[in-house]
Amino acid sequence: MLETFPIHMTSFKQDRQIRVYLPKGYNHGKKKYPVLYMHDGQNVFNDEDAIGGTSLELEKYLDERGLEVIVVGIDLNTEDRLNEYCPWVNGEYSRKIIGQLQTSGGKGKEYVEFIVNELKPFIDKNYRTIKDHTAMAGISLGGLISVYAMCRYPHIFRNIAVFSSAFFRNQEEIEKLIKESDLSLVETIYLDSGDKESGNKEMINKEFLHSNKVIYDLLKEKVPRTEFEIISGAEHSYAFFRERAPMIFSFLNE
């Protein structure tokens, strides 16, 4: 069952659509459930709402398997996604991959604070949640902001799963943050990356993969249950992301 509603984002002075998946048995008991927060909400649950027409199809996947988890999808702002999902302004590593210096980014801190201070309290108040069993998952820039959220709030986001993360946008800063963060409360981290993220652009493929490997190495030092997979032939598109969606739940539920 999927519910949708707008919620006000104080820092951004705007409303944002929220999509909440409730497991099949939710309305037939008083059981409490763990919660998974995901970004790019339009692309999480079904193709009908997906911006590019292809989603992760999680509503169908979760219903078919009867998984007992509440999933909260936060809609993306199509005009400001890069700014909201990047905690810092894009740096030199980003320029190296893209080929030009960009000044996007820098609103990620406020976006994560919205999740922690406004959205999560609302979800915990209005749904039967296990408040201290909270995970986060994201794709591309959603992966970057998920790892940032974990570093800033490791006591909240103890389980993280990210696909094809665009760490390169804030490579220098996210490396520094990981090194400085106490992640002793974090339980599990799953990362992956395709080896053809940019199709036939081999230089970008190489740098993108290297970016993810560096982050994996840093996280593995701090969180023993950190896993990284290189997906052969996988490109940066939802056709490939959808195939890996089950990994979110198989890893987080171990």
Predicted regions and their residues:
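Non-catalytic cap/lid and distal C-terminal segments of serine-dependent acyl enzymes
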Residues: 1-254
